[in-house]
């Protein structure tokens, strides 16, 4: 089946099966179709697409909601108070499909179809108050929180509500809320008549790699059950996006995944540029690719060292941090910052490459291959490391897709899925590189894949070094923000545009757009909704880490606590990426 036939065939099959319950196809600028369904077939349509259709859609990439109460530009869309959106991916078709449901605050659950919908529905309940007809606990906000933060009626800043006063009664209530009863979660306290030990692993344990708690039921050292508890790092990033200008939100993207640097900026800007109709110049595209691959290496070096450390090897992390500093020195010279560069712009990048950038990059490229060889001898060829990781924490491709796993965690199972190859963006189609794959889907393969990815990133950076085109680093487009400085100095129209964009903000045309990239942890996706104003009406941030943690309870039963620590390290997450 060709790509141009993949989606029309799926749409026709859906319409044939459900008829008038497929209410409308929304006209958008997206690269995939958007269908509105009737509530009566919401669950059945998802089951049909996942289990019954030829070349199915096994991956629920995202599930999110939009409060439509203040939205003005909704031509051709069914009336809705809160719209529920699901984003499905077919690997066989290499195609996406988005389904929408108009709700009055109630929606059918699809957790019985897509297992990973559980956390997404909990989030939609937490943020919007959606009722899915089943018991749904808050997931990001504390249980004592009043209201649903992503509703338009909910305040965005603390200054919009009375001063906070911590009374004795409130303190006691908050303290009680921190106690989690396994009975209320449906988790057993006994095994073969013996009482299990309930252990709080985190939220301040160094091996949780952030403020993350896992409630464990233990029989001796063996994990019987696990219940992840997230939200401690939640900062309301999606709410912040509604209060910032389109340009002003870029620095916040860096803090979604604070180890990813510009990688977190790119999907947001791809979405905004799609809405604006901006074509980014070739030089800016290649600069973006080069910097993204640098940050991919920076992240993987950190993972590599801490992965080894969590199974008892202390030396590698110190060597790898030293090499990370060499990379960060280059990034600092180019972007002006090490970890939070805010360097990409709507229509390009902030500035051109500095004088001498090529010598710095060439030095790094000459240095790193031998270092990676040394790390392979220290870690991957270590008998102790292999004994702790081979065959531990293994899962197959079907299980990975069931729980929304993407990136190295998916490719470690042997699944060749990398958006840089399959759906090239920002000029990735110009580069020659391989996609490293594993076989067993265990901790060792997840480590091996990331180690090999660093070598491929070096290949991409070397090609950027040898083929960097000349030309501008910002698009010549009225919505490029900020406009090219040279143009501002020559004509009054560009200067006026700069003044308006800097004071009021860029006016982005009404519509919806999605930016997808192959991030260092997996599929990173920004879905933005513009109502024709200077701020986003809705910004949905789909991060890979949120999906990856949900699979922990299915993987770790039967492990020892020590193996649990190794498995957590092999996921490679940061809690800001989970909690946003």
UniProtKB/Swiss-Prot annotation:
Keyword NAD: yes
Region called NADH dehydrogenase I subunit D, residue ranges: 195-580
Catalytic activity: a quinone + NADH + 5 H(+)(in) = a quinol + NAD(+) + 4 H(+)(out)
GO molecular function: NAD binding; NADH dehydrogenase (ubiquinone) activity; NADH:ubiquinone reductase (non-electrogenic) activity; quinone binding
PROSITE patterns documented for this protein: COMPLEX1_49K (PS00535)
UniProt-listed Enzyme Commission number(s): 7.1.1.-
Keywords: Cell inner membrane, Cell membrane, Membrane, Multifunctional enzyme, NAD, Quinone, Translocase, Transport, Ubiquinone
GO cellular component, one term: NADH dehydrogenase complex
SUPFAM superfamilies documented for this protein: HydB/Nqo4-like, Nqo5-like
Gene3D superfamilies: Cytochrome-c3 Hydrogenase, chain B, NADH:ubiquinone oxidoreductase, 30kDa subunit
Disulfide links within the chain: none
Annotated spans, NADH dehydrogenase I subunit C: 1-171
Location relative to the cell: Cell inner membrane
Main subcellular localisation: membrane
Residues passing through the membrane, by range: none
Enzyme class: translocase
Topology of this chain in the membrane: Peripheral membrane protein
Complex formation: NDH-1 is composed of 13 different subunits. Subunits NuoB, CD, E, F, and G constitute the peripheral sector of the complex.
Job of this protein: NDH-1 shuttles electrons from NADH, via FMN and iron-sulfur (Fe-S) centers, to quinones in the respiratory chain. The immediate electron acceptor for the enzyme in this species is believed to be ubiquinone. Couples the redox reaction to proton translocation (for every two electrons transferred, four hydrogen ions are translocated across the cytoplasmic membrane), and thus conserves the redox energy in a proton gradient.
Similarity remark: In the N-terminal section; belongs to the complex I 30 kDa subunit family. In the C-terminal section; belongs to the complex I 49 kDa subunit family.
Name of the protein in its database record: NADH-quinone oxidoreductase subunit C/D
